[in-house]
A protein has these predicted regions:
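Conserved BB-loop
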Residues: 13-43, 58-64, 121
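Short glycine-/small-residue-rich Rossmann-like dinucleotide-binding loops
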Residues: 5, 56-57
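C-terminal interaction surface of TIR/SEFIR-family domains
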Residues: 3-20, 87-192
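Short beta-alpha junction loops
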Residues: 31, 57-58, 84-94
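An anion/phosphate-binding loop that grips the pyrophosphate of nucleotide cofactors and donors
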Residues: 48-49
Length: 192
């Protein structure tokens, strides 16, 4: 599951609905432990047969989420593996909406480039330059990614998405019971 932390409640609901259908999600809240590398975990999306993208406005403006998208896009057969759930806040279905995200990433790139110039390229030779390269990659791929999402049929309602997702997995023989305890924020059990 690729999602923005701003959408954590929706991610827990998605997990609970999928678990009830026998689908176990691999996501940071269940798999990462203290001091684990988030970047290494994010790169796992390249190896998964399916990646659910919980796409919201926050997701599309998150450098971490878009880095994860690039990892998936650079993996094998990304169109066959991406399963987007487009939330209402994501403005991807109009050219103006998509253009707004491309402009956003152009602005993020320009802003960091100016900040690096202020401190000097030598002082920013490490991670800041890597971030600048990443922002440029996000900017260069944003239109392609957003157009791909807008062109695909993907339910925008959570329950409908779960039904379609599980129907596809059942046809492939991929349904199993989650092996970990399911709890929502506050320790509420999601399993009866």
């Amino acid at each position: 599951l690729s999602y923005c932390w701003d959408d954590l409640d929706m991610a827990y609901m998605l997990e609970a609905l999928l678990a009830a259908k026998g689908v176990e999600l691999i996501w940071d809240k269940r798999c990462l432990k203290l001091d684990d590398s988030i970047s290494q975990f994010m790169s796992l999306g390249c190896d998964c047969s399916e990646v659910i993208l919980l796409v919201s406005n926050s997701y599309l403006k998150s450098q971490s989420c878009m880095k994860e998208v690039l990892e998936v896009l650079n993996g094998s057969e990304p169109l066959q593996r991406i399963r987007p759930l487009i939330l209402p806040s994501a403005q991807i279905f109009s050219p103006e909406g998509r253009a707004g995200y491309v402009q956003y990433w152009a602005g993020e790139y320009e802003h960091l480039q100016k900040e690096i110039r202020k401190i000097g390229r030598g002082a920013a030779a490490g991670s800041l330059n890597q971030d600048l390269v990443l922002l440029n990659q996000i900017y260069e791929n944003a239109d392609h990614f957003l157009s791909m999402l807008a062109d695909r049929y993907s339910p925008t309602e959570l329950l409908e998405f779960v039904e379609h997702f599980c129907a596809g997995r059942q046809q492939q023989g991929c349904i199993s019971r989650p092996s970990y305890p399911l709890t929502a924020p506050g320790g509420i059990s999601l399993r009866s």
